[in-house]
Amino acid sequence: MLYLIGLGLSYESDITVRGLETIKKCKRVYLEAYTSILMAANQESLEAFYGREIILADRELVEGGSDKILENADEDDVAFLVVGDPFGATTHTDLIIRARELNIKVEAIHNASVMNAVGACGLQLYQFGQTVSLVFFTETWKPDSFYNKIMENRRIGLHTLLLLDIKVKEQSIENMARGKLIYEPPRYMNIETAASQLLEIEEMRQEKAYTPNTPCVAISRLGSPEQTFKAGTLQELSEYDSGEPLHSLVMLGRQVHDLELEYLYEYVDNKEQFKKFVEEDQEFFKPPPYVPPEDENLSE
């Protein structure tokens, strides 16, 4: 049996009771180590808490060597630990598909993830649209497919959760070309970089999916003791020191509920100014007033 076990967001003790009991009975325990990190725990503290040795599973192992993870899983119990919830990344879905192809039974044990814990910032979960990812730009590569999804969300008034890039155990193009197995230091996108890249794409596209004054919420270290929120415009957040990782960003939709706005006031520098920007932003994508069709019988 292959068990995909969510670890939650921060502490080693965030795991569920069922998840912990399952780990203790598994023959091998892998920790997926490249789509996210636990902010208040590490491999050593996890091993001490679980009482088990943990095998780090990097991108190369998960995406290129899944057969090693699944080896004998038709007879032995194998645990695959994921920060957050097991279904927070497409990579984990792919692992399940490969297991099924080998007739290996799979069970998921869920936990909190950024996808549901984001509600802690005060925005209502059912007011969120499509989630998008924002990757680090390079001089020659600035993907902007996220822009269309933000546009779609804002056209129907919904908030957009942006997941910010994480680079762990990545190789430079130069080292890859030379065949050198040298990895770059880990990089975690901060709020300043995310907001700046969003503004750069709007400047390039000029389609007004958002503006420098579009209200957003910066979310830092969600679920940890150092969790913080900061509400402001994109322009303001492009100059905001968000501190240590991990970070996410929410761009507000047009339909901001009064309770949501009242909650966000706790995280703004200037309440009246933020309210003004929200009201101005609500005019974007505002549907035209309804005009009933002419009654042909009356016109006769």
UniProtKB/Swiss-Prot annotation:
One of its GO terms (cellular component) is cytoplasm. The keyword DNA damage does not apply. Keywords: Cytoplasm, Methyltransferase, S-adenosyl-L-methionine, Transferase. Pfam families: TP_methylase. GO terms for biological process: methylation; protein histidyl modification to diphthamide. It is found in: Cytoplasm. Its main location: cytoplasm. Pathway: Protein modification; peptidyl-diphthamide biosynthesis. SUPFAM superfamilies: Tetrapyrrole methylase. Transmembrane segments: none annotated. Its EC number is 2.1.1.314. It catalyses: 2-[(3S)-amino-3-carboxypropyl]-L-histidyl-[translation elongation factor 2] + 4 S-adenosyl-L-methionine = diphthine methyl ester-[translation elongation factor 2] + 4 S-adenosyl-L-homocysteine + 3 H(+). GO terms for molecular function: diphthine methyl ester synthase activity. InterPro entries: 4pyrrol_Mease, 4pyrrol_Methylase_sf, 4pyrrole_Mease_sub1, 4pyrrole_Mease_sub2, Dphthn_synthase. CDD domains: DHP5_DphB. S-adenosyl-L-methionine binds at L9, D85, G88, S113, V114, L164, L222, H247. S-adenosyl-L-methionine-dependent methyltransferase that catalyzes four methylations of the modified target histidine residue in translation elongation factor 2 (EF-2), to form an intermediate called diphthine methyl ester. The four successive methylation reactions represent the second step of diphthamide biosynthesis. Belongs to the diphthine synthase family. PANTHER family: DIPHTHINE METHYL ESTER SYNTHASE, DIPHTHINE SYNTHASE. This is Diphthine methyl ester synthase. It comes from Debaryomyces hansenii (strain ATCC 36239 / CBS 767 / BCRC 21394 / JCM 1990 / NBRC 0083 / IGC 2968) (Yeast). The lineage of its organism: Eukaryota, Fungi, Dikarya, Ascomycota, Saccharomycotina.
